[in-house]
Amino acid sequence: MTPDLPAILTCLRAELPAATLAHLRNPGPSGQDSLLVAPEHLVAVCQFLHDTAELDFDLLSNVTGVDWPEPAKADAVAVPAEGTAPVACGFLEVVYHLYSTTRRLGPLVLRARTVDRVEQVHIPSVVAVYRSAEYQEREIFDLYGVKFAGHPDLRRILMWDEFLDHPMRKDYVAPDDYQYEPTPHDAVLEKTQQYYTAKS
């Protein structure tokens, strides 16, 4: 069942009055509206949605990235129901799909945007709330370049360590003659061992 987004937004504003939130309407055929959350309030919003018994969004099924080099195109796809200032010089967006398995609700779609595509590309990690975000955030970091602050093991997951770019960005140009140089297997094992040793 589709969540009642206006009602959820009302609950969030009552509980987190300082949070910057906006209801984005989807003019497309799916009509799947979403909630735009300022990055600095993302973890608190996720924690509230997860922990509040009346909502109980206990499952994060999917996290994905979107590259918006031209903000006007983003505005055409997701129209703000309330006035929000356009973001200059493009941005990266992270999209979260939440479900309540107990109440059979979902997806509730959350969006968080970086300030730009070059220097201010940080979004807080939600791994502390939803463990299922761990690999998906790594994938977005690898392919889009979003840096998830507080992630327990933020490193490339698909491309090799020495790869310099982010191949899912819309301005990425694939070279036609580069040498594939994967990280040596022993080096990968050593990095993995350091990670698990630090956690234990």
Regions found by a protein language model. Give the residues of each.
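Terminal low-complexity/charged segments
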Residues: M1-S200
